[in-house]
């Protein structure tokens, strides 16, 4: 028999989501570094090859020039930001589901799950944008040959000194454009696959680890299929010199399409997709493990 439905606890989602986010960063950061460097590399001069010819070339050159630490450059910022960010993300999803339920027995439709996921994207933008801004600046400085920042705190301090609090929130609109629809797709896909993988008469809470990993991994792939174009624009905008794009993302979009074509909106696609499966598989597995632990120690929380 299937278990009785449990009331949704946004607070448990908050705690378990933070742990899931930490798992995601440790697994996925090296390829995130590759992704950002591919997205922000300047156009190659006539007759000269680009700095990186692709995902594997960027990975190899980073490893050769900077060692394994180069692949984890800038990780402190997402670790500091990602725990509360994923906590808030899963909290927003849990709250979005709870607001649409009249009782714990109500099964939400997939459009309702998509809506709950979009709410989580709105919730996370305030935390996500500063961390992404610092992370991107640190990730590209080594490949550009400029060492303006010695680390996460130094980057944060200099950003504040130069631009004030607004310096941390450069790219907020693009972060919203990326995360709101992508988060809806993320959670809807995960819930759909969990239901698909659950044998008849069983509970989704009894899913095996391999099935959770597959559901989480494909949720990450579907998420990034939606998110890549605005993510490319965001990375380019957040790492640009002050004043380069006075009209915001519209200027970035026009420049990219004019100089590099529509395919430039999918720069870093291979790195993103290679990273998306293992990183998000780790995230959802971490979330489910933490949730089981919380349900065990505090069933009525």
UniProtKB/Swiss-Prot annotation:
N-acetylalanine modification, residue list: 2
Protein name: Mitochondrial carnitine/acylcarnitine carrier protein
Membrane topology, as annotated: Multi-pass membrane protein
Mitochondrial matrix-facing ranges: 32-73, 132-170, 231-267
Compartments reported by the entry: Mitochondrion inner membrane
One of the record's GO molecular function terms: O-acyl-L-carnitine transmembrane transporter activity
Its biological purpose: Mediates the electroneutral exchange of acylcarnitines (O-acyl-(R)-carnitine or L-acylcarnitine) of different acyl chain lengths (ranging from O-acetyl-(R)-carnitine to long-chain O-acyl-(R)-carnitines) with free carnitine ((R)-carnitine or L-carnitine) across the mitochondrial inner membrane, via a ping-pong mechanism. Key player in the mitochondrial oxidation pathway, it translocates the fatty acids in the form of acylcarnitines into the mitochondrial matrix, where the carnitine palmitoyltransferase 2 (CPT-2) activates them to undergo fatty acid beta-oxidation.
Residues with PTM N6-acetyllysine: 148, 157, 170
Gene that specifies this protein: Slc25a20
Family: Belongs to the mitochondrial carrier (TC 2.A.29) family.
Ranges in the topological domain labelled Cytoplasmic: 2-12, 94-112, 191-211, 288-301
One Pfam entry name: Mito_carr
Species name: Mus musculus
A GO biological-process term: in utero embryonic development
């Amino acid at each position: 028999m299937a278990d009785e439905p449990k009331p949704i606890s946004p607070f448990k989602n908050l705690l378990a989501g933070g742990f899931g986010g930490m798992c995601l960063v440790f697994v996925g950061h090296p390829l995130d570094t590759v992704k950002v460097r591919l997205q922000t590399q300047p156009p190659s001069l006539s007759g000269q090859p680009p700095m990186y010819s692709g995902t594997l070339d960027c990975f190899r050159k980073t490893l050769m020039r900077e060692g394994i630490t180069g692949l984890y450059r800038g990780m402190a910022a997402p670790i500091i930001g990602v725990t509360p960010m994923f906590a808030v993300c899963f909290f927003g999803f849990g709250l979005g589901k709870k607001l649409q339920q009249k009782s714990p027995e109500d099964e939400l439709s997939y459009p309702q799950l998509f809506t709950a996921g979009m709410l989580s994207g709105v919730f996370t933008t305030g935390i996500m944008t500063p961390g992404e801004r610092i992370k991107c600046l640190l990730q590209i400085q080594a490949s550009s040959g400029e060492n303006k920042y010695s680390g996460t705190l130094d980057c944060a301090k200099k950003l504040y000194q130069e631009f004030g609090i607004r310096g941390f929130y450069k790219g907020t609109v693009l972060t919203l454009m990326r995360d709101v629809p992508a988060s809806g797709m993320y959670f809807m896909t995960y819930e759909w696959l969990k239901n698909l993988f659950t044998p008849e008469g069983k509970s989704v809470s009894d899913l095996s680890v391999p099935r959770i990993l597959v559901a989480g991994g494909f949720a990450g792939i579907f998420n990034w299929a939606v998110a890549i174009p605005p993510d490319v624009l965001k990375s380019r905008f957040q790492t640009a010199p002050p004043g380069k794009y006075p009209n915001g993302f519209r200027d970035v979009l026009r420049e990219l399409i004019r100089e590099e074509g529509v395919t430039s909106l999918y720069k870093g696609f291979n790195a993103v997709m290679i990273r998306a499966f293992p990183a998000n598989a780790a995230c959802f597995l971490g979330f489910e493990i933490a949730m089981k632990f919380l349900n065990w120690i505090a069933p009525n929380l």
